[in-house]
Amino acid sequence: TAANADSKPYATIAGIKAVQSHLDRLGLNAKVEQARRPFTYKVTYAVPDSHPLVSIIIPTKDHADILNNCITSIVEKSTYDNYELVIIENNSTEKVTFDYYDKLQAKYPDIVRLVTWEHEFNFSKLMNFGVAHAKGDYLLLLNNDTEVITPNWIETMLGICAREDVGAVGAKLYYPDNTIQHAGLCVTGGVAGHLCQSMPRNNWGYFALNDAQQDFSAVTAACIM
């Protein structure tokens, strides 16, 4: 027995080696590290050697300040550099919004493309319209009211998404008050519901599930690759 986890660092090292060996045997290019909670492990999958283009597709209507926060956080914080921003304009009416579009395209002509959806709001049709204008190898759907807080978010999602056995990858999202907005969806009885919603951001949850990569029934389209 031990008073705390730090008393047996060799156990943590052994755990890392065990998980790393498993991934190596599977032929997966990934690195294993200790996660925040003792005896839990973080796996970072390598980005494909082709350094693929990621199309970030963002639907928006007015509220230029909100969109600006989103775009600025992507451009200033993201460490992955091969991406494009497909902005879907959906029936905005405010002049400040269209002025912002002009400034945005002038400032980032190589990565920003504005497309206009002239029909009534329908999320599925709206996003499919944006996808039709995307040039990337991978698609990342993103709400305009989100803000990047983790610099390596694109490559982290991309590394997982590039695996042949993965269909889609979501992200852990927080409300402004640092509580959990999204940490995966569970479908029970034909109804989808958020897991651990409104729990404190740093709450690990049952068996540290709030802090671990795992399979879910679904993930929110607010941020999905």
Regions found by a protein language model. Name each.
Residues 118-126, 131-134, 148-149:
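A short, glycine-/small-residue-rich helix N-cap motif at loop->alpha-helix starts
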Residues 139:
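Short aromatic/hydrophobic "clamp" motif used to bind/position activated sugar donors
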Residues 147-190:
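Conserved donor NDP-sugar-binding/catalytic core segment of glycosyltransferases
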Residues 124-125, 132, 188-225:
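A recurrent flexible, glycine/aromatic-enriched loop bordering the glycosyltransferase active site
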Residues 75-116:
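Acidic donor-binding segment of Leloir-type glycosyltransferases
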Residues 1-17, 180-190:
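Nucleotide-sugar-dependent glycosyltransferase catalytic core
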Residues 90, 142-145:
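Active-site acidic Asp-centered loop
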Residues 8, 20-76:
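N-proximal low-complexity "stem/linker" segments adjacent to membrane-targeting elements
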